[in-house]
Amino acid sequence: AVSSDGKNWVLINASPDLREQMNSHPQLWPDAHVSRGTRISAIVLTDSQIDHTTGLLTLREGLPLPVYCTDVVAEDLTTSFPLFTVLKHWHGGLQQHSINTDYHQRFVPKGAEGLTFQPVVLESNAPPYSTYRDNIVPGNNIGLKITDDTTGNVLFYAPGCMQANDTVKQVMRESHCVLFDGTLWANEEMIDHGFSNKLGTDMGHMPVNGKGGAIALLNEFNVERKVLIHINNTNRVLDEDSSAYHSLCEQGIELAYDGMEIEV
């Protein structure tokens, strides 16, 4: 979640453990006189993946809420994985606002005054249940460039990225903090563990290690903070005794963790 004032929060993606996250962070709790609700003013979805959307069900008693997403994501969430359809029965449901995939189309979610959001089209894949699986169109996955209007500082959030296009590289160059896809250490990781027959890139994720990986990409840019996010439990960087973890530390790349706070 991001905030410009520490009082109103915009939730970026809604993971399955959202209730636990809210219970652990008093910043999201409502004022004492509010019988039902949170300090979440709006939601921004970057894709229609299960791990980024099922937390919407947790928010059902606090609806209506504005949700910002691309039209492609909204289509998935009303057809292939119809959370929007289900939730419309709670107090008017989610009020969908379309995100234009044009990088120059800035927007400000409700409650985020003082911050400017820009969509960054990411080359990734749609969820397995989507009609766009392996038939990728702009809007299946986006990153977010978030700029503080007062300081001009920039945060770039890119949770699912198979390869970096020119816009991604441009935004990285302009950023003070980059939160980037760290799902898998190696492209063959899920195959090697016997969990899938697909490469990381088949699923839409750039491996962290190796030529063309996230480490090599991040090292191209002089960014104050580089943080890997969206880390799968098969990823060896989670073992702090591993050479992979120490390699990251030596290169100034951080691992995200639950409850991590970043001020930009």
What are these regions (language model features)?
Residues Q21-N23, T54-L56, T78-T79, Y129, ...:
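Short glycine-/acidic-enriched loop or helix-start segments at secondary-structure transitions
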Residues S4-D5, P26-R36, T85-H89, D148-T150, ...:
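Alpha-helix termini
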Residues G139-N141, D149-V154, M162-G259:
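Cap/insert and terminal regions of metallo-dependent hydrolase folds
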Residues L11-S15, R39-D51, C69-T70, F156-C161, ...:
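Active-site neighborhood of phospho(di)ester-bond hydrolases with catalytic His/Asp-centered motifs
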Residues T38, S48, G92, E113-L115, ...:
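Structured loop/turn residues at beta-strand edges in well-structured enzyme cores
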